[in-house]
């Protein structure tokens, strides 16, 4: 069960980070460059 909880938490954080990067592309340009999965 712990593995599923960790996966859910990681996926939720990833979705939040993705939405934040998409909404604030200009402000988080430095974060979007190293990640490189925005587009």
From Swiss-Prot:
Q: What else is known?
A: Negative results: has no effect on human neuropeptide FF receptor 2 (NPFFR2) and kisspeptin receptor 1 (KISS1R). Has mild effect on ASIC1a channels (31% inhibition at 10 uM) and no effect on ASIC1b channels.
Which purpose does this protein serve, as stated in its record?
Answer: Strongly activates (at 30 uM) the human neuropeptide FF receptor 1 (NPFF1R), a G-protein coupled receptor, with an effect that is equipotent to the endogenous RFRP-1 ligand in activating NPFFR1. Is toxic when injected into Drosophila melanogaster. Also shows a moderate anthelmintic activity against the parasitic nematode H.contortus (drug susceptible Kirby isolate) (IC(50)=20.1 uM).
TM annotation in the entry:
none
Q: Where in the cell is it found?
A: Secreted
Write down which residues bear the modification named Phenylalanine amide.
37
Top-rank taxon of the source lineage equals Eukaryota
Q: What is the species of this protein?
A: Acharia stimulea
Signal peptide limits: 1-23
What protein is this chain from?
U-limacoditoxin(13)-As54
């Amino acid at each position: 069960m712990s593995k599923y909880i960790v996966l859910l938490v990681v996926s939720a954080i990833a979705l939040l980070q993705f939405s934040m990067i998409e909404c604030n592309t200009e402000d988080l340009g430095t974060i979007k460059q190293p990640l490189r999965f925005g587009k």
